Amino acid sequence: VKDCSGREKIMERRHFLKGAAIAGAGAALAAPAVAQGIKTLTVVSTWPRDFPGLGISAQRLCARIDAISGGTIKTEYFAAGEKVGAFDVFDEVAAGNSQAYIAADYYWIGKHPGFAYFTSVPFGMTTPEWNAWVKFAGGQALWDELSAGFNLKAITCGGTGAQCGGWFNKEINSPEDLQGLKMRIPGLGGTVMSKLGVSTVSLPGGQIYENLVSGSVDATEWVGPYNDYFMKFYEAAKYYYTGGMHEPGGGLAFGMNLDFYNGLTDHERAVIEAACYEENAAQPEEAMANNGTYLNKLVNEHGVQLRAFNDDVWDAFGEAAEEVFEETREHSDLAARINDSYQAALRDIGGFRAIAEIEFSTQRNRVLGMT
């Protein structure tokens, strides 16, 4: 990373990780009576080590678990490829070879399409809306039911906030411009794109840049300006679409082996949940604090051209999304119940936000000249 401020931010996070580890070690020394009862928690992730944004978040979470536990839990963190491949973490943890993974659960829609709803779906909930559904409107119970079928227990441990529409090597002025495009886009968003003639692939984050530069893909979505800046996608694609239908929230999962989870004490569960919920708040807040700054860097330092999908393209997205949701419901009773719960919460929670927060922010931005 050439940007000095970017290096400083990464170094700051590394200092946090080091500090948290020291704090955890200090707590362990202060409680020698429980030293022999230390529980090892092996965590595998879908992101490379020190990966800006998502990877740093995963490492920070593990350091928090160590620190909060007072030495009773010791995490062993393995980034993508260090123990298993990025997309192998689900099976690794389900089999009990590792105790937990940190990932976006929509990577597992090949196992069950219901997993998509526990990351994000097209035209779905924003991060705070999704958190409200998971924690207080029935989402966690459905997530538990879905995950238990694979010997897993998952809780939320992060969120990206609303994501951008993606990086393209040509402008998208009509739905027809999407036909024949090769794009990295996972989840049900990828299924929507497929219905519009896009050839989609789901690549781990660490493999996107090389495929974009080589021309193996013509476009990619990732997260937002803060995370995308360090990926250097601007070296291969100059058109950055600012609003995306595919991931309005981007929730992340801390998926534990169910047998391991059932063997935890109430205190150990509380420690893990506290660390996960703290990171669940920290990650989107970090992105929100930095997205504006890094969007300006992309435009002013690297000549990135911002674009927005027009109404015709958005309408095409919407029509395809309706088909995808209906097909998802037809998969199984559980898929239908997850979809129906999600959609009902979206209309309830999102409906209120539209007449309160969104109306306010729209008028605030107009009055202050921010639009």
Task: Give the ranges of each region predicted by the language model.
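N-terminal secretory/targeting leader peptides
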Residues: 7, 12-29, 36-130, 145-371
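Core domains of carbohydrate- and sulfate-ester-processing enzymes
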Residues: 138-141
